[in-house]
Amino acid sequence: MHILLANDDGYLAPGLAVLHAALAPLGRITVIAPEQNHSGASNSLTLQRPLSVYEAREGVQKGFRFVNGTPTDCVHIALTGLLEDKPDLVVSGINQGQNMGEDVLYSGTVAAAIEGYLLGIPSVAFSQVDKGWEHLDAAARVARTVVERIIGTPPAEPFLLNVNIPNLPFEHIRGYRATRLGKRHPSQPVITQVNPRGDTNYWIGPAGDARDASEGTDFHATAQGYVSLTPLQLDLTHRGQLDALDQWLK
């Protein structure tokens, strides 16, 4: 089993190191991650300049390769030229903070898994609910459990999974739930600041609170102490509007 690891928090992030340690007994692990934090990068590719790949020489990251680009860059170049043999599985994470509801449209963590899926490799994104790295050991144990299940009982079709893990001690996690994406309220307003030169600067505001956290959603499952596993698809066609649009065009 050959597993490619990526993330969006950068190759020095604790979530990547513990994920690597947790999955190492399961097979050969290749790490190719961004040099810097690229949270919110979504599926962006770097097209205006060449990319470089480096290798960490010390610490727990020794042997990790990192790229001066986005999470999608990392997986793309890994699967389209950098690696001589393609991995059996792409795993992204463990992200610092949840990726639920509309978060999946912005998340670099989910984007890395999407790129693997687009290039024909089963892919999983792992995120830990709430900021901070509390109970990261528990999140790593959950990730290993999910990957072991994938290895032992592979799904019948190529898959793209989004996994969100409650920020709890392992013994307090109640189990696993198959979920759908919930929905958020719109994001909070931008935060404005005036710098010493008198220029106005803008910071993107916090994400909106959950609007649909009903039973069956990722928001509901994690709030109840369950690990949320959401199968994703990439077809954004609104099929319910096709007939109406066709009539509108006539």
From Swiss-Prot:
Catalytic activity: a ribonucleoside 5'-phosphate + H2O = a ribonucleoside + phosphate
Entry keyword annotation includes Hydrolase: yes
UniProt EC number: 3.1.3.5
PANTHER family (alphabetical): 5'-NUCLEOTIDASE SURE (PTHR30457), 5'_3'-NUCLEOTIDASE SURE (PTHR30457:SF12)
Family: Belongs to the SurE nucleotidase family.
Role this protein plays: Nucleotidase that shows phosphatase activity on nucleoside 5'-monophosphates.
Protein name as annotated: 5'-nucleotidase SurE
Organism, as annotated: Cupriavidus taiwanensis (strain DSM 17343 / BCRC 17206 / CCUG 44338 / CIP 107171 / LMG 19424 / R1) (Ralstonia taiwanensis (strain LMG 19424))
